[in-house]
A protein has these predicted regions:
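Hydrophobic alpha-helical transmembrane bundles of multi-pass membrane proteins
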Residues: 1-248
Length: 248
């Protein structure tokens, strides 16, 4: 990897990391005022806990040398053997994906989950669910990779994975007592959405792992898609309610 691509991937990794506090603001602005801090911490603590888990064993279970079709190995525990620059860059970028994925799930159970319980869930889910699925699809030994599965920027590993987990979590914790609650802080929601939009340039454009034409195309498509979604939301809101709104 040349110096330009190294710099690009470091920037993209930082952009993806920025998405997690952005998600914290986004979710925090949607819940009731008394639950803002706990909701924000759900996302924010993922940065610390998942970073440690990823370095100690998460990366090794996902991409460890000598893995089989279903799981990696413990050959790279604590990043042992992760010495060359290209591998380190890849491990860092993948760590940012692992951080935001469980944070996405918290929107399904915010206000209804004890923080200590969430910490246990966070460690177990990244270890037992995220790492194996990342291995299946993104590691060259993974069984889905061998079948030709394509996942350029986490559509399956991150979003489908988190979505299914969110559905299961919502079913387990049950319905909200007050499903019609209003957002407590719309500026938080807008700030969070803006940070997510900005971070997505790193998420998508960095997934080619190189500063090249693929990155440029991904950057352009990402911005165009987000802009189109914004305009569509505003138009539908005006049709439905007669006014535009950031939230509903």
């Amino acid at each position: 990897m040349d110096s330009g691509s190294i710099a690009w991937m470091l920037v993209c990794s930082a952009l993806v990391l920025l998405m997690t506090p952005g998600l914290a603001f986004f979710y925090g602005g949607l819940v009731r005022r008394k639950n803002v801090l706990s909701t924000v911490m759900y996302s924010f603590i993922s940065i610390g806990v998942v970073s440690v888990v990823w370095v100690l064993w998460g990366y090794s279970l996902s991409f460890g040398e000598g893995g089989n079709a279903f799981i990696g190995t413990l050959n790279n525990v604590a990043f042992m053997g992760v010495e060359d620059t290209d591998t380190q860059i890849f491990a860092i970028f993948q760590m940012m994906f692992a951080i935001i994925t469980p944070a996405l799930i918290t929107g399904a159970f915010c206000e209804r989950f004890k923080f200590k319980t969430y910490l246990v869930f966070l460690i177990l889910w990244v270890t037992l669910v995220y790492a194996p699925i990342a291995h299946w699809i993104w590691d060259t030994n993974g069984w889905l990779y061998e079948l030709g599965a394509l996942d350029f920027a986490g559509g399956a590993v991150v979003h489908v994975n988190a979505g299914i987990a969110a559905i299961v979590a919502a079913m387990l914790v049950g319905r909200r007592r007050n499903p019609g609650m209003q957002s407590n802080n719309v500026p938080f929601v807008v700030l969070g959405a803006s940070m997510l939009w900005f971070g997505w340039f790193g998420f998508n454009a960095g997934s080619g792992l190189e500063a090249n034409g693929i990155a440029v195309n991904a950057f352009l498509v990402t911005n165009t898609s987000a802009a189109t979604a914004m305009v569509t939301w505003l138009v539908l809101g005006m049709i439905h309610t007669g006014k535009s709104s950031s939230v509903s």
